[in-house]
A protein has these predicted regions:
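Catalytic donor-sugar/metal-binding loop of nucleotide-sugar-dependent glycosyltransferases
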Residues: 104-105, 126-129, 139-155
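A conserved acidic beta->alpha catalytic loop
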Residues: 1-5, 49
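Acceptor/aglycone-binding surface of glycosyltransferases and processive sugar-polymer synthases
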Residues: 16-36, 41, 53-131, 157-168, ...
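Cell-envelope/extracellular polymer assembly enzymes that use nucleotide-activated donors
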Residues: 136
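Short, structured coil segments at secondary-structure junctions
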Residues: 10-12
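C-terminal, non-catalytic tails of nucleotide-sugar-dependent glycosyltransferases
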Residues: 173-183
């Protein structure tokens, strides 16, 4: 409804229609396409206006060998009212749970701004269909010894309604962290 597809095509971009519902399904499809194309690095950026594309270069420059880098909103420029107190507390709790269960340091589990090396994507084991995809990427890195770096980023207030439901999606993310610890 916002003409994104036609604008992207006019600019010469290849537009890929998502085959499944949910953020996780879309990301997995994007990873598959990336591996087919043969590039060396990939950036994942939520397109909700909260992240700043001009910071992509900083993330790409910070990817460790065969690893990933996560844009860290909580140690960066978290703009006023960009994150509700419920989401901030939930992210803190989920991030703490992730480190407690999986042992690999992470500062912002629910960040929507990541950069990946090809080797890291080839090694990720993913099956998530929804918002728990970041937790699954983290646990895959933890268990497969994929290096993780963190870069402070700017995070702005979202325009429009968020699709993330604090309690429902937070529970799903926690469940993914626990299941990945057990299996």
């Amino acid at each position: 409804t916002d003409n994104t597809v036609s604008i992207a095509e006019e600019l010469g971009c290849e537009v890929i229609q998502q085959w499944g519902e949910g953020k996780g399904a879309g990301m997995r499809q994007g990873f598959k396409k990336f591996l087919e194309v043969g590039d060396d690095e990939l950036v994942m950026l939520d397109c909700d206006g909260t992240y700043h594309p001009e910071e992509i270069t900083r993330l790409l420059d910070s990817i460790p060998k065969n690893g990933i880098v996560i844009g860290d909103r909580l140690h960066g420029n978290l703009q006023s009212n960009a994150m509700t107190s419920t989401n901030w507390i939930g992210n803190q709790l989920l991030t703490w749970l992730a480190v407690a269960l999986h042992g690999k340091p992470i500062y912002d589990l629910c960040s929507g701004f990541w950069a990946f090396s090809r080797n890291a994507i080839e090694r990720l084991q993913l099956n998530s269909m929804r918002f728990e995809i970041e937790a699954e990427m983290y646990t895959s890195c933890a268990h497969r010894n994929i290096p993780i770096a963190h870069v402070p980023i700017t995070y702005s207030k979202r325009v429009g309604e968020a699709k993330l439901g604090s309690i429902k999606d937070g529970t799903s993310i926690a469940r993914k962290l626990i299941i990945r610890r057990i299996f």
